[in-house]
């Protein structure tokens, strides 16, 4: 139960931060381009790289800290960071084909799923 709570707390903080970054970039740069989403995805990818190295590899941190920061906080801030870490991990393990398939499938299938969801709802309207 404590692990789920840590994920929830981290996720709430990450989600709030994502919201505030989105609002800030909207005020600063306007609505013509999704700057907020781009910002959280790039920053989240950098931060997950830092956390993965420090928490998991250098300090051998507890499962709870990983759940709070990586699964919770970064999961709430951006799921793109988790996707990117998974893809890089495949490439670093020498699994280039799997990494390429995972990357193309993740982006392609995600975009197809969004298009399908839009089409379903538009058809029902």
Curated annotation (Swiss-Prot):
Membrane topology: Multi-pass membrane protein
Main location: membrane
Binding residue positions for Na(+): 75, 78
Known regulation of activity: Na(+) is not transported, but it plays an essential structural role and its presence is essential for fluoride channel function.
One Pfam family it belongs to: CRCB
Highest taxon above the source species: Bacteria
Gene Ontology MF: a single term: fluoride channel activity
GO cellular component, one term: plasma membrane
Location in or out of the cell: Cell inner membrane
UniProt keyword Metal-binding present: yes
GO biological process: one example: cellular detoxification of fluoride
Catalytic activity from the UniProt record: fluoride(in) = fluoride(out)
Keywords carried by this UniProt record: Cell inner membrane, Cell membrane, Ion channel, Ion transport, Membrane, Metal-binding, Sodium, Transmembrane, Transmembrane helix, Transport
Transmembrane portions of the chain: 1-21, 32-52, 68-88, 101-121
Family of the protein in this entry: Belongs to the fluoride channel Fluc/FEX (TC 1.A.43) family.
Summary of the function given for this chain in its UniProt record: Fluoride-specific ion channel. Important for reducing fluoride concentration in the cell, thus reducing its toxicity.
Name this polypeptide is given: Fluoride-specific ion channel FluC
């Amino acid at each position: 139960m404590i692990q789920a709570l840590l994920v929830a707390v981290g996720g709430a903080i990450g989600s709030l931060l994502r919201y505030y970054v989105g609002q800030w970039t909207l005020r600063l740069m306007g609505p013509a381009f999704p700057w907020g989403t781009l910002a959280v995805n790039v920053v989240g990818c950098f931060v997950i790289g830092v956390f993965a190295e420090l928490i998991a590899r250098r300090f051998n941190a507890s499962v709870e800290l990983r759940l709070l920061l990586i699964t919770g906080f970064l999961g709430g801030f951006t799921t793109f960071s988790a996707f990117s870490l998974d893809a890089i991990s495949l490439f670093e393990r020498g699994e280039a084909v799997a990494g390429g398939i995972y990357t193309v499938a993740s982006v392609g299938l995600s975009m197809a799923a969004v298009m399908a969801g839009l089409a379903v709802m538009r058809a029902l309207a």
